[in-house]
Every structure is written in structure tokens, then in C-alpha cells.
Design a protein with these regions (language model features):
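Conserved loop-alpha-helix segment in the C-terminal half of the alpha/beta-hydrolase fold
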Residues: 236-275
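Flexible "cap/lid" loop of the alpha/beta hydrolase fold
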Residues: 115, 123-169
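Short glycine-enriched nucleophile-adjacent loop
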Residues: 107-118, 124
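Conserved HGGG/HGGXW glycine-rich cap/lid loop of the alpha/beta-hydrolase fold
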Residues: 20-71
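Active-site loop/oxyanion-hole signature of alpha/beta-hydrolase fold enzymes
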Residues: 60-105, 116, 280, 285, ...
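Catalytic active-site module of serine/aspartate enzymes centered on a nucleophile-bearing elbow/loop
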Residues: 265-332
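N-terminal cap/lid segment of alpha/beta-hydrolase-fold proteins
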Residues: 2-21
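Conserved alpha/beta-hydrolase catalytic His-Asp/Glu region
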Residues: 135-136, 160-232
Length: 334
């Protein structure tokens, strides 16, 4: 599975450390920009954005190991090994340094890249930089290991897990094929405002991913302490996120909290009204415009008004009425 773009060049990069290959698509001319998709999708996520950013840059859109047309990740992979695979990708294609755009898990890969390979990273555009509540992150990782998270299609029927990401028998194959409908329903619940075309492609991407086996990036990701890493990041950074994205309390810290942990002197936030998990598909023009404007001049980029950001950060994914905060910021004469 890949984008349906006709004008891209398609190929495979050789990854020296894992001995595998990584599928990618590229187009355009100019400074390199690498797009990293979220779990459990593949590079179709950026289909609408790539041609617009390629007007000013050479864009690269790979399928992470275990996704799309790339082979499964080795079973021994940790999260930082997934990051290393992108350095191997750059090495094989002769990319000395690049800017990066990523959504959700792709943003976490970018954070690790910027921290451990600062000389290879120019500018960063994070989509939904997700910091799990720490106890939840660790319990999810342990639960997935216990039920055989890398072999989800073969697991026994288990009880549902958390509100985000079911640690359950959802992904096991069933003789009546109903598991395929469950994949669809999961994607539709998460992206009910998006086009059926996108929901269908996300469903197919999930099926394709779990048919591969190998190390699952989301399992590896849950072992990664993002909060420990963020203060070491100094590159110019933009948080590009939809106001309907799932990266919100109480399961995650806010995007503003994540941004404040960075040591970047240029540190901006852009909120796309109406955007959710499928932000880059549903709002391709708005995302491409923000990406091009920020890459062109990070310091001059304005982003979203601080008051609008503050209001957006109050919204919870799951309301917690024990933590209500009331503010009166009106201006009074007397």
C-alpha cells in the first residue's frame, strides 16, 4: 500500500544495521524534508501534502519498518532501533541533513532523531507529540508484552484494555471474517469526521501491518521515556496539531506542555481547527501551507495566537470533572 500519486519516484533503501529495506516515495527539488507516518498506517497519510511541499523541497515519504511496503521490523528492535533505521535510510540515499514532519508516533521518532543525531536534523514539525501519562504508558507496555503484542492476530480472546489502543483480542483472525469489520469500526470511531476513503485506507493499512508480524512499533514506543529526551532538543520546532486530535488529557499531556519541555529557541504552535488524527489527509492544504511557511522562515512564522492555544489546551479527550479550572481573563474598567 502506498500513495496514489503518479509523479513520485518509488524505491527501496538498504538499511545496514537491520539488514532489511525501507520502501519510500520521493518528488520535488530543494532542501530535503522527510515525512514519518503514524502507527499503524503508512505513507498514504501524506498523499495530499507531498505535492504541495515538493514545490519548494525534495520530499521523502518512507514506510516505517513493519508498515506498508516495508518488511517487518526485526523482533529484537527497541524504539531507538526504529529511529536508527531512518538514519540508515538517509545514509543509503545520501541525505546528510534533513527537516522532518511526523504525526503521533512519527513525532516521537523525530524527537529521538533530534536528540541522538542533532547533526542530521535541521527543522522539526511535530504533529501530535504524545506524552503518555507515565503509569499508563508502562502498564500498556507490560500488558502488550504479556499477551504477545507482536503476534496480535494469533492471541486468544482477551478483555478490552484502555480507552486509547485496545489491548484485546480485537486483532485476532476470526473464521467469519468479522475481525475485518472490527478494524473498520475502530478506524471509523476514531475518525468519524473523515472521508470513508481515508477510513478504508487506514483499515487496510492496519490489516497489512498486523499480517507482517515482527516487532510492533507501538509496543516499542511505550517503553520509550519521551519526557527524558525532550529537553535535549534544540532545533527550530513547530507543533502542528488539529484541535480534535486525541493527544489531550487525561491520557496525554497537552501539546503545549510537550512544547514547553523543548530547549528550542524557536518553538511555535499551529492549531488547525477541525483537524483530528487524520489531520494531514483532511487538511492537506492547511498543513502544507504551515510546513512551507515554517521551513521558509521559522523565526518569522507566527503560528496560533497564544490565547487561542491556551483555550484549546483546556479541552480533555475524556472529561474529568474533578479537575475543573475556571478563569476570568476579561478586561474591566472598574
Amino acid at each position: 500500500m502506498a500513495t496514489n500519486l503518479k509523479q513520485v519516484k518509488r524505491g527501496f533503501a538498504n538499511l545496514k544495521r537491520s539488514g532489511t529495506q525501507m520502501y519510500y516515495e520521493t518528488m520535488g527539488q530543494g532542501s530535503p524534508v522527510v515525512f514519518i507516518h503514524q502507527c499503524w498506517w503508512n505513507n498514504f497519510e501524506y498523499e495530499g501534502v507531498l505535492p504541495l511541499v515538493a514545490k519548494e523541497h525534495t520530499v521523502y515519504s518512507p514506510d516505517s519498518l513493519g508498515f506498508g511496503f516495508s518488511p517487518a521490523a526485526p523482533g529484537w528492535f527497541e524504539f531507538t532501533d526504529f529511529t536508527d533505521s531512518f538514519i540508515d535510510f538517509m545514509d543509503d540515499l545520501g541525505i546528510a541533513k534533513a527537516s522532518f514532519v511526523g504525526q503521533h508516533s512519527g513525532s516521537l521518532v523525530m524527537a529521538d532523531l533530534a536528540s541522538r543525531y542533532p547533526e542530521r536534523v535541521d527543522k522539526l514539525i511535530f504533529g501530535g507529540l504524545a506524552i503518555y501519562e507515565d503509569e499508563l504508558r508502562k502498564s500498556k507496555a507490560a500488558r502488550r508484552d504479556m499477551i504477545g503484542g507482536n503476534k496480535m492476530p494469533y492471541t486468544k480472546s482477551l478483555r478490552p484494555g484502555d480507552l486509547i489502543g485496545l489491548e484485546s483480542g480485537l486483532l485476532q483472525r476470526k473464521e467469519d471474517g468479522s475481525h475485518m469489520v472490527e478494524y473498520w469500526l475502530e478506524q471509523y470511531r476514531e475518525n468519524s469526521d473523515s472521508k470513508f476513503e481515508y477510513v478504508q485506507r487506514a483499515t487496510i493499512a492496519n490489516l497489512l501491518h498486523y499480517d507482517k508480524g515482527g516487532r510492533d512499533m507501538i509496543n516499542a514506543l511505550l517503553t520509550y521515556d519521551l519526557e527524558r529526551v525532550l529537553p535535549s532538543i534544540t532545533q527550530p520546532s513547530l507543533q502542528l496539531v488539529g484541535d480534535r486530535d486525541c493527544v489531550k488529557p487525561p491520557l496525554f499531556k497537552t501539546v503545549k506542555e510537550a512544547a514547553d519541555m523543548l530547549s528550542s529557541k524557536i518553538n511555535k504552535i499551529k492549531i488547525v481547527e477541525g483537524g483530528g488524527i487524520m489531520l494531514f489527509l483532511d487538511y492537506a492544504f492547511e498543513c502544507a501551507e504551515a510546513i512551507n511557511d515554517f521551513l521558509r522562515d521559522p523565526e518569522a512564522y507566527e503560528g496560533t495566537d497564544s490565547r487561542e492555544v491556551a483555550r484549546a489546551m483546556k479541552e480533555y479527550l475524556v472529561p474529568d470533572f474533578d479537575k475543573l479550572v475556571f478563569d476570568d481573563n476579561n478586561v474591566y474598567v472598574v
